[in-house]
Amino acid sequence: MRRRALMLMSIAAPVLGIANHGHAQDGSKPFTPEQLDQMLAPIALYPDSLLSQVLMAAGYPLEIVEAARWSKANPTLKGDAAVAAVKSMSWDTSVKSLVAFPDVLTNLDSHLDWTQKLGDAMISQQQAVADSIQRLRAKAAAQNNLKTTPQQKVTTEGSGDNVQYVIEPANPQVIYVPAYNPSWVYGPWPYPAYPPVYYPLAGAMMSGFFWGLGFAAGAAMFSSWNWGRGNAYVNVNVNQAQNIDN
């Protein structure tokens, strides 16, 4: 993320105000709630920090490609060690952070049409994206598929019709990436014309929910959703982000 963007996001500015990369929808119709749920289904249950950085990075698809190539050329580097190794790269901070998670980066690189849509949606419809994330999390919770585990801590904010689901790593220094089949984890899918996207991570089961190894990547996490101030707001730890670049 560019330095100016970091400073603005640190005071909870909407993503639209600081991350317009010039390709958002280009005058076409906005994505519908059904389309957003479809494209966000594979990642809505990621920890908040990782999810926000994936969506930021999706706005830089060419850099995603370059970072994925670097990751494939350096297969022994993962977690914070990988992030430290790309400090000198000119990529956005969010893209650099994803080299900590090779499978996540590979998924974004292998399905660039999906990645482009994620980036477009985050740039031009950030509130709708946040609403979709919470809608999907509520579905998973209703199926008893979103709960606190040794890998993650799940809490809620708000009450009544305004409950927000917060997902954090159980250990802030060790990040686990869930792999799951959206058709299973969310229960009956309400939009037959828009089945959920499913790009399983390496090693994931064809159905159900799977935890792989945790990554020592606490230093790579610099953002989170500020659900309490409106779903579309993302908080950035400026010092943490600058440590990735410098």
Which residues does each PLM region occupy?
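N-terminal export leaders
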Residues: R3-M7
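N-terminal non-cleavable signal-anchor helices
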Residues: L16-A19, T155
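Boundary at the C-terminal end of the N-terminal hydrophobic targeting segment
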Residues: A19-D26
